[in-house]
Amino acid sequence: MAHKKGQGSTQNNRDSAGRRLGVKKYGGEVVIPGNIIIRQRGTKIHPGKNVGMGKDHTIFALVAGVVTFHRKDKKRQQVSIVPAA
């Protein structure tokens, strides 16, 4: 017969690493084609002119220029690039 009780284990001691989401290039910053502007889950910010959107909703630059953020309508925000002349 055992004289010591078995050790219990905790259940809630797991945590995942942060996903490094957010704005990577802010308004007024200069970008080149392929630069990631925003990493996001879902379309929190929508793509505008001269930007593309990846399958994970990452917004990236299609042309060289300056990043601008603006409102599409009351609810939706949009990011575009003003091409470098």
From Swiss-Prot:
Residues 1-22 are annotated as: Disordered. Keywords: Ribonucleoprotein, Ribosomal protein. GO terms for cellular component: ribonucleoprotein complex; ribosome. SUPFAM superfamilies: Ribosomal L27 protein-like. PROSITE patterns: RIBOSOMAL_L27. It comes from the Bacteria. GO terms for biological process: translation. The keyword Cytoplasm does not apply. It holds the Pfam family Ribosomal_L27. InterPro entries: Ribosomal_bL27, Ribosomal_bL27_CS. One of its GO terms (molecular function) is structural constituent of ribosome. Belongs to the bacterial ribosomal protein bL27 family. This is Large ribosomal subunit protein bL27. It comes from Sulfurimonas denitrificans (strain ATCC 33889 / DSM 1251) (Thiomicrospira denitrificans (strain ATCC 33889 / DSM 1251)). The lineage of its organism: Bacteria, Pseudomonadati, Campylobacterota, Epsilonproteobacteria, Campylobacterales.
